[in-house]
Amino acid sequence: MATGKIVQVIGAVVDVEFPQDAVPRVYDALEVQNGSERLVLEVQQQLGGGIVRTIAMGSSDGLRRGLDVKDLEHPIEVPVGKATLGRIMNVLGEPVDMKGEIGEEERWAIHRAAPSYEELSNSQELLETGIKVIDLMCPFAKGGKVGLFGGAGVGKTVNMMELIRNIAIEHSGYSVFAGVGERTREGNDFYHEMTDSNVIDKVSLVYGQMNEPPGNRLRVALTGLTMAEKFRDEGRDVLLFVDNIYRYTLAGTEVSALLGRMPSAVGYQPTLAEEMGVLQERITSTKTGSITSVQAVYVPADDLTDPSPATTFAHLDATVVLSRQIASLGIYPAVDPLDSTSRQLDPLVVGQEHYDTARGVQSILQRYQELKDIIAILGMDELSEEDKLVVARARKIQRFLSQPFFVAEVFTGSPGKYVSLKDTIRGFKGIMEGEYDHLPEQAFYMVGSIEEAVEKAKKL
């Protein structure tokens, strides 16, 4: 085991000098004793002359030149398997929940090759989420990749927690949650939410939160993914939740300049597409098992053309776009039904009835969008009878796309609702065909199935 010495420390980036004949490989883990703390460094570049440039997987406070550094001669390895379920771990797989050792039987390196072409499998099976707007407009595929896109404060994390609750309870498989650069409070809330709904023993939690150094945030997604890959390779269907994939990119940006790379567009790292690809290509389903992933994607300044969300788009099967405009109307989940897409929305996959209903809903909402300008200038009275009907139905559809969430009961005061796909299609089809034209639009707001809307109308 070779030993080197620290020669330079710039924030999270540490340069270490080794003997010329024992230079560590790229991605090898190094260990340094920083006072009472053990700090792990990951090799990023070999600079020549025996010097390697590394990223610290923890705070570099207190490091000084001349400290001894050990080469562990392997990449960072984390615990995998059933021992990780119900536990909270950090980027190195160390427990942070005060419940003692993990007690794992196996450890895997966090850098692994993506599955080869012949190992990949293609599934057309739908995953029901119980959230009306998602099941109807952008259905999820089992073993597919889903992105929740939204600016600050439009409900990405709440939507994700609802999805985890619904899918974990209904689907009863294992899940891995990777908290990448998010609020510690949300991580804490999430743990208690899982404990209260009795699914904590089926979830592994890996956190590298906002206050952690960039090295942790850059690698914690890989730690969570490695744990999910182990479950997949045992032949299971796993769910991988990443909140938030944008912070993974951001952590890469933070260390990129310190590693001496020229910034590219908007100051992002030049290797943005490659870093994203390395992560996303591993999140895939094989003939042995599947990984279904749901990723929250923060959209800087609500601009979907920003390089980071734009790079993420290319890798996804379904995109759920959360809109500030819809949130401002008080309609939650604030999913934009005209912007959200899914590869599964194909009559050969979802069936003709589902496809026609979804496209019908979109065309009514699109027409309403076009008529809004006329209404703003001339008022409703100037519209033709046909257009008045379209507007009335569109407003009902818009309200019926809202739904009370289980995880938001504390805020809304109304009990959460899980709506089956069959009921969702029936409800929207009925509104489009004019079966509920006699009901007031308020009856459709924050209800589950269409029967509840009819009941609510009687009380208004």
UniProtKB/Swiss-Prot annotation:
Keywords: ATP synthesis, ATP-binding, Cell inner membrane, Cell membrane, CF(1), Hydrogen ion transport, Ion transport, Membrane, Nucleotide-binding, Translocase, Transport. It is a peripheral membrane protein. Produces ATP from ADP in the presence of a proton gradient across the membrane. The catalytic sites are hosted primarily by the beta subunits. InterPro entries: AAA+_ATPase, ATP-synt_VA_C, ATP_synth_F1_bsu, ATPase_a/bsu_AS, ATPase_alpha/beta_chains, ATPase_F1/V1/A1_a/bsu_N, ATPase_F1/V1/A1_a/bsu_N_sf, ATPase_F1/V1/A1_a/bsu_nucl-bd. It catalyses: ATP + H2O + 4 H(+)(in) = ADP + phosphate + 5 H(+)(out). HAMAP family: ATP_synth_beta_bact. This is ATP synthase subunit beta. Belongs to the ATPase alpha/beta chains family. PROSITE patterns: ATPASE_ALPHA_BETA. F-type ATPases have 2 components, CF(1) - the catalytic core - and CF(0) - the membrane proton channel. CF(1) has five subunits: alpha(3), beta(3), gamma(1), delta(1), epsilon(1). CF(0) has three main subunits: a(1), b(2) and c(9-12). The alpha and beta chains form an alternating ring which encloses part of the gamma chain. CF(1) is attached to CF(0) by a central stalk formed by the gamma and epsilon chains, while a peripheral stalk is formed by the delta and b chains. It holds the Pfam family ATP-synt_VA_C. Gene3D superfamilies: 2.40.10.170, Bovine Mitochondrial F1-atpase, Atp Synthase Beta Chain, Chain D, domain 3 (1.10.1140.10), P-loop containing nucleotide triphosphate hydrolases (3.40.50.300). The lineage of its organism: Bacteria, Pseudomonadati, Pseudomonadota, Gammaproteobacteria, Enterobacterales. Its EC number is 7.1.2.2. One of its GO terms (cellular component) is proton-transporting ATP synthase complex. The keyword Kinase does not apply. The keyword Ribosomal protein does not apply. It is found in: Cell inner membrane. ATP binds at residues 150-157. CDD domains: ATP-synt_F1_beta_C, ATP-synt_F1_beta_N, F1-ATPase_beta_CD. GO terms for molecular function: ATP binding; ATP hydrolysis activity; proton-transporting ATP synthase activity, rotational mechanism.
